[in-house]
């Protein structure tokens, strides 16, 4: 079941890739993918190329994939362990969701962080109290780690 669904998502991604994103298997392992997200133009991550790993559980799509950044990023909802605080990867997961939708949700999280549900409270505080500083540090990290 999982492999059939993963193969379908791979062919859907090839046919209709989401804007600014790509994903596919690492070698022959269909349960381990690498994804790429281009830093959105309307964000301090513009120009950056961010890599992520995707691990599908054997009971996918009934359980969510594990998605993590491998490129460092300064963001209140992504911590230094590269975990992503995104409800659809946890409690709000649904088998109707796809990797394409997950990647688009991560893109929108880059443009529109959620400082009220942070993984990194200090970055959330800066985002809420000093947006210029947040944007400056985010751009610096993007230039240092994602270009």
From Swiss-Prot:
It catalyses: S-ubiquitinyl-[E1 ubiquitin-activating enzyme]-L-cysteine + [E2 ubiquitin-conjugating enzyme]-L-cysteine = [E1 ubiquitin-activating enzyme]-L-cysteine + S-ubiquitinyl-[E2 ubiquitin-conjugating enzyme]-L-cysteine; S-ubiquitinyl-[E1 ubiquitin-activating enzyme]-L-cysteine + [acceptor protein]-L-lysine = [E1 ubiquitin-activating enzyme]-L-cysteine + N(6)-monoubiquitinyl-[acceptor protein]-L-lysine. Keywords: Apoptosis, ATP-binding, Cell membrane, Disulfide bond, DNA damage, DNA repair, Endosome, Membrane, Nucleotide-binding, Phosphoprotein, Transferase, Ubl conjugation pathway. Its EC number is 2.3.2.23, 2.3.2.24. One of its GO terms (molecular function) is ubiquitin-protein transferase activity. It is found in: Cell membrane; Endosome membrane. Its main location: membrane. The keyword DNA repair applies. The keyword Phosphoprotein applies. It is a peripheral membrane protein. The active site is at 85 (glycyl thioester intermediate). Pathway: Protein modification; protein ubiquitination. Disulfide bonds join 21-107. Residues 1-147 form the UBC core domain. Pfam families: UQ_con. GO terms for cellular component: endosome membrane; nucleus; plasma membrane. One of its GO terms (biological process) is DNA repair. PANTHER family: UBIQUITIN-CONJUGATING ENZYME E2 (PTHR24068). Interacts with SCF (SKP1-CUL1-F-box protein) E3 ubiquitin ligase complex; when Cullin is neddylated, the interaction between the E2 and the SCF complex is strengthened. Interacts with DAPK3. Interacts with BRCA1; the DNA damage checkpoint promotes the association with BRCA1 after ionizing radiation. Interacts non-covalently with ubiquitin. Interacts with E3 ubiquitin-protein ligase CBLC. Interacts with UBTD1. Interacts with RIGI and RNF135; involved in RIGI ubiquitination and activation. Accepts ubiquitin from the E1 complex and catalyzes its covalent attachment to other proteins. In vitro catalyzes 'Lys-11'-, as well as 'Lys-48'-linked polyubiquitination. Cooperates with the E2 CDC34 and the SCF(FBXW11) E3 ligase complex for the polyubiquitination of NFKBIA leading to its subsequent proteasomal degradation. Acts as an initiator E2, priming the phosphorylated NFKBIA target at positions 'Lys-21' and/or 'Lys-22' with a monoubiquitin. Ubiquitin chain elongation is then performed by CDC34, building ubiquitin chains from the UBE2D3-primed NFKBIA-linked ubiquitin. This is Ubiquitin-conjugating enzyme E2 D3. The lineage of its organism: Eukaryota, Metazoa, Chordata, Craniata, Vertebrata. The gene is UBE2D3.
């Amino acid at each position: 079941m999982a492999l059939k669904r993963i193969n379908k998502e791979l062919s859907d991604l090839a046919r209709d890739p989401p804007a600014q994103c790509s994903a596919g298997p690492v070698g022959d392992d269909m349960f381990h993918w690498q994804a790429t997200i281009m830093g959105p133009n309307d964000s301090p991550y513009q120009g950056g190329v961010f890599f992520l790993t995707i691990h599908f559980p054997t009971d996918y799509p009934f359980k969510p994939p594990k998605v993590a950044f491998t490129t460092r990023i300064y963001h209140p909802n992504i911590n230094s362990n590269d975990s992503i605080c995104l409800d659809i990867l946890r409690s709000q997961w649904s088998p109707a969701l796809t990797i394409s939708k997950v990647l688009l949700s991560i893109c929108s999280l880059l443009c529109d962080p959620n400082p009220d549900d942070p993984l990194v409270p200090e970055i959330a505080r800066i985002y809420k109290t000093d947006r210029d500083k947040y944007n400056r540090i985010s751009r610096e990290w993007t230039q240092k780690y994602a270009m």
